[in-house]
Amino acid sequence: MAKKEGALELEGTVVEALPNAMFRVELKNGHRVLATISGKMRQHYIRILPSDRVVVELSPYDLTRGRIVYRHK
C-alpha cells in the first residue's frame, strides 16, 4: 500500500453509510469525518458496514474529509 506524502492515518469506526460510497467515520479522538473508499478497496469489492473498524487517511489541508484505506478483520 503506497503512502501519501504528508497524509495522516487515523483509526476509527464507521457510524453510518451514506449514498455514493461515502461513510461517516468517528475517529478515536472523537472527531467525525466524511470518508470515501480508496480505489483499490473498490476494485477488490471490499464491503464496509456500519460498526466496522477502519483506517482513514486524512489530508493535512482538509481534516473533515478522508479516504478509507484499510478495514480491520
Swiss-Prot record:
One of its GO terms (molecular function) is ribosome binding. InterPro entries: NA-bd_OB-fold, RNA-binding_domain_S1_IF1, S1_domain, TIF_IF1. Residues 1-73 form the S1-like domain. The keyword Cytoplasm applies. Transmembrane segments: none annotated. Keywords: Cytoplasm, Initiation factor, Protein biosynthesis, RNA-binding, rRNA-binding. Coiled coil: none annotated. It holds the Pfam family eIF-1a. It comes from the Bacteria. It is found in: Cytoplasm. GO terms for cellular component: cytosol. Belongs to the IF-1 family. Component of the 30S ribosomal translation pre-initiation complex which assembles on the 30S ribosome in the order IF-2 and IF-3, IF-1 and N-formylmethionyl-tRNA(fMet); mRNA recruitment can occur at any time during PIC assembly. One of the essential components for the initiation of protein synthesis. Stabilizes the binding of IF-2 and IF-3 on the 30S subunit to which N-formylmethionyl-tRNA(fMet) subsequently binds. Helps modulate mRNA selection, yielding the 30S pre-initiation complex (PIC). Upon addition of the 50S ribosomal subunit IF-1, IF-2 and IF-3 are released leaving the mature 70S translation initiation complex. This is Translation initiation factor IF-1. It comes from Cutibacterium acnes (strain DSM 16379 / KPA171202).
